[in-house]
Design a protein with these regions (language model features):
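Short histidine/acidic/glycine/proline-rich micro-motifs that form metal-
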Residues: 72-76, 197
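C-terminal regulatory/interaction regions
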Residues: 218-279
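Conserved beta-strand hairpin/beta-sheet module of binuclear metal-dependent hydrolase folds
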Residues: 1-37, 137-149
Length: 279
């Protein structure tokens, strides 16, 4: 449950291990679900606040709780000042309302991953594209792939799939390579943070690839205001359920979608200038 919506942010549990505890603002819901017993560990796909902001509060509650995160994200758990400064630029005075308080995690609790490890029955692979500190986990026994934001957002019961593209790390080519890595696992299902399980793995990943390119091209051709209006119109044409629409827009705030794609193109000036209509 995040700000009154049940299908926006999910925390997965396997054998007592939690994958992406979510924001501190949703922590009461998580604690109600797991009870008083300390989890075996926290596995983070990445350190974006909707996935990981509750981490510090959980370690504060259970001081021996171990946390696994990519090596690029680990320093920002220990000292979240830069992460907070970046988030404040993005969310302004809505930061604490959306994500709650972000507490530091003692360095002794943090285990840095690079990809290629096996941790608590989970294979780990480095999957940048959405974030430079993103990893995915494959639970070898069940074949479930815990994919964070790499496999995009899909709010049930709609089939609309939308990759979240906030700044600063969006890289379409790296993202496509990460999708190929996940697909090569041949997982039995994908476990999305936003939201739920996906059984038709190949079809879903194909749509993510297509949608990534579509959104990148749209952002290349339009300015921020026009892109947001265009994206909102396309989403509303596909979703006629007001509750589902509200949950999607909470999981993927449209105001931040353009920024990551625009930054992606700004690093590729030659390609951006070749866009149709570019002068």
């Amino acid at each position: 449950m995040h700000l009154g919506h049940p299908h926006v942010i999910g925390c997965w549990e396997v054998d007592g291990v939690l994958i992406d505890p979510g924001p501190e603002s949703s922590l009461p819901t998580l604690l109600e679900a797991i009870g008083d017993e300390q989890p075996r560990a926290l596995l983070l796909t990445h350190i974006h606040l909707d996935h990981a902001a509750a981490t510090g509060a959980m370690v504060e509650r259970w001081p021996s709780l171990e946390v696994y995160v990519h090596e690029r994200g680990a320093p920002h758990l220990v000292d979240p000042s830069k992460l907070l400064a970046s988030a404040e630029r993005l969310y302004g005075d809505r930061l604490e309302y959306l994500w709650g308080k972000i507490e530091p995690v003692p360095e002794a609790n943090v285990h840095a991953l690079s990809g290629g490890e096996t941790v608590l029955g989970m294979r780990v692979v480095y999957t940048p594209g959405h974030a430079s500190h993103h990893v995915c986990y494959l639970h070898e026994e069940s074949g479930t792939a815990f994919v964070g934001d790499v496999a995009a957002v899909r709010i049930p019961p709609t089939n609309l799939i939308l990759p979240p593209t906030p700044p600063p790390d969006i890289d379409i080519e790296l993202w496509e390579k990460s999708l190929a890595i996940v697909e090569a696992w041949e997982p039995s299902r994908l476990a999305l943070t936003h939201f739920g399980a996906v059984a038709n793995v190949g079809t879903h990943l194909d749509v993510v690839r297509t949608r990534l390119r579509q959104e990148a091209e749209a952002a290349r051709e339009l300015d921020a205001e026009a892109y947001e209006a265009d994206l909102k119109q396309r989403i509303e044409a596909d979703i006629d359920d007001a509750q589902v629409l509200a949950e999607l827009l909470q999981a993927v705030p449209l105001a931040y979608q353009y920024g990551g794609l625009d930054r992606y193109w700004s690093k590729r000036p030659g390609l951006a200038e070749s866009a149709p209509g570019a002068s």
